[in-house]
């Protein structure tokens, strides 16, 4: 029997039991498609995560300060963090207090509930990339907070694209206009561009947002202490060294109580997310592999039935 005869015989066997052949192929098709889709989705998500980390910058670190005992930050002050950066300017390039909570804003008769409010310093804006260091958003109108705005606790703000559109009809019209936060009027000095990807939203960004000087935010929140600081190092390569410097200062400040603070780098956060994604991908691939195995068993079953029928 030559190859042509074997091929015709195989086609005849397939067409003899069309439903059986269809179900067999369906099992394999679903199994293979599942593996392809899962791997494609995993690679896509991985790419989006890497893109967002690159946008935020691997030279960024977050330091949480909870303090000792009753949870207060004791006598730790933002000026201590500024002094730390100044003393280690070869490794650290800046630090910003970071106060975040949801606030209610008003403009005339309009009310905006659950707007994300960020209290920061001028360091939160990277003048080289002309974007925020916590979300990579660029300005479309105006400017960001300045050193004098923060130092003098000026009632000025930078808002997101959603807020600019809904409250004022656009970014250009928003400049110089006023928004009320807890009865205090804040003048809009800048408008950020619109977020485009779900990854940016998942990273904590939102178009419904407003930036104000951090001490103003503390006053609105009714808090005394800053519990989160955002540092930047000279490069991604010096991030680990910068973290060691920050942790060393806090270790001494809190007299060896390592539960009083926590510092994490963007690289560490990315590695954690990648590890979690690896576990999820492993589970999904295992499920897809089971589908392939079931399909393979189905094929073996059909082959056995076909051979049995031919030998009778």
What are these regions (language model features)?
Residues 8-12, 288, 297-312:
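Intracellular coupling helices
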Residues 98-99, 110-220, 224, 241:
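Hydrophobic secondary-structure segments that place a key small or acidic residue at a functional site
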